[in-house]
């Protein structure tokens, strides 16, 4: 049986930390920022952790395959 390939789109969007959690970037933070206030744009540039356990298991399978 051949080796499992990792999902390249998921690898570009998610990163696994050393503790095993999944880090992701927030959406809506790349363009049309003049319509959003400064507090919101600052928050959108910060990365966050994935909090859905079932999605985390699926994404780990895609990234670490």
From Swiss-Prot:
Family under the similarity heading: Belongs to the bacterial ribosomal protein bL35 family.
Secretion signal, residue range per the UniProt entry: none
Pfam families per the UniProt record, alphabetical: Ribosomal_L35p
GO MF: structural constituent of ribosome
Ranges of biased composition (kind: Basic residues): 36-45
The keyword Ribosomal protein belongs to this UniProt entry's keyword annotation: yes
Name this polypeptide is given: Large ribosomal subunit protein bL35
Presence of keyword Lipid metabolism: no
Gene Ontology biological process: translation
Provenance organism: Chlorobium luteolum (strain DSM 273 / BCRC 81028 / 2530) (Pelodictyon luteolum)
Residue ranges of the region described as Disordered: 28-53
Key words, A-Z: Ribonucleoprotein, Ribosomal protein
GO cellular component, one term: cytosolic large ribosomal subunit
Gene designation per UniProt: rpmI
């Amino acid at each position: 049986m051949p080796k499992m390939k990792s999902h390249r789109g998921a690898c570009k969007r998610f990163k696994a930390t050393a503790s095993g959690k999944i880090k992701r970037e927030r959406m809506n933070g790349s363009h049309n920022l003049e319509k959003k206030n400064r507090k919101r744009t600052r928050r959108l540039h910060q990365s966050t952790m994935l909090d859905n356990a079932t999605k985390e298991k699926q994404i780990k399978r895609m990234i670490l395959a």
